[in-house]
Amino acid sequence: RLESTGSTMRNEAVKSLAHGNPDLAQRALNRERQANKIFVLMLRLIFTSYHNPNLARAVGLDDGFPLIGYRSIAKNLELTADNAEDIAEIALESENNTLEVDSATMKRIRDFTDQVNELTEMAVEAAVERDYNTAIEVREQFSGIGNRVQEILDDLPEMDNTDLLEVREVLVSLQQTAEYAVRNAEIATNLALNEESQHTTIQ
């Protein structure tokens, strides 16, 4: 739920920039409170489960080891919601609530957003399912978009410094979100390897 809230915020913020629609940016900002609330509830559940083995078993955990990883994942997801909030604030503060780029560049930014969304969703799925292969796929896909920010910036025409900074801040926020997804995938890898699977044998 925290991942999907962050993803929705990201989509609304970037769509706001694409269409010059401040209402969408405001909607994204309003969701930040919901994201924080989910994060706090998750921390409470994790903390309580860690100290109560019966509760941990009730939510499908045989031991407390995954809870440490889940706490880190929750924090990373909360930070991705902060990234989306940053993009929404740029949309509200920028002139005409949009970026000073052509439609082709805006499409590249939206495509990049879609790729980032896919990474964050896959990373959480890998952690929940303890799926080693999905976790590895996240890292492989990330390597394929690792230079996307620089590629888009390099292709921009000469522009006002303020406009350039806004574009750069949006792209960096998306890049950071992708990096958090990779961190979550690394945690998912550890969770998967902690279980008996085709990759490991636990004595």
Where are these regions (language model features)?
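Cytosolic, long alpha-helical scaffolding segments
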Residues: 1-203
